[in-house]
Amino acid sequence: MELMAITAKGIAIKIRNFEIPDIRRVMEIEEQSFLDGDAGLYLELYEEWPEGFMVAEKEDKVIGFVVMVLTPEGEGRVFALAVDSRYRGGGVGRTLLKAAFAVLRKMKIWYVLLEVRVSNVVAQRLYRCMGFVEIGFVPFYYKDGEGAIEMRKML
């Protein structure tokens, strides 16, 4: 899968499937965005479902990524979404999510779930703008003890 897109903020990007050489850049973005990253886990998720791992490129440099997983119950789940700090707020994350939703719809998956840190109000705002609604709370979800808000979007 590969598509050219202009984000809502006018950034020209290419959305494409993840490739193994992208892992170094993905981990750099991961380290900017999250407290704990695991390259081995990302590669394992890629091996399980390659179509669920997409990157956004600007001028041949990865500037963001989304990782989705399929649950045994047939649900879609956003495992990770991250954008290089220099491009946050530019619509890259929103564009990655739209591409991810298109993949899920093609597979006849009608809703997607995710968990987001209670403290990550910027991500919560993005997800709400994209149509996610809060459906629950999981205390002590993350390794550092922070809780997570569970959210769902009907596709």
How should these model regions be labeled?
Residues 6-13, 17-86, 97-99, 103, ...:
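Acetyl-CoA-dependent GNAT
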Residues 15, 89, 116:
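Conserved SAM-binding loop
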Residues 78, 112-116:
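Conserved hydrophobic beta-strand within the GNAT/NAT acetyltransferase core sheet
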Residues 83, 117-118:
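Short amphipathic helical patch at the helix-1/turn junction of helix-turn-helix
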Residues 89-102, 125-129:
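Conserved acetyl-CoA-binding loop-helix of GNAT-fold acetyltransferases
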Residues 93, 97, 120-123, 140-145:
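Short glycine/proline-centered loop/turn elements that form peptide/ligand docking sites
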Residues 115, 128, 133-149:
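Conserved catalytic-core motifs of GNAT/GCN5-like acyltransferases
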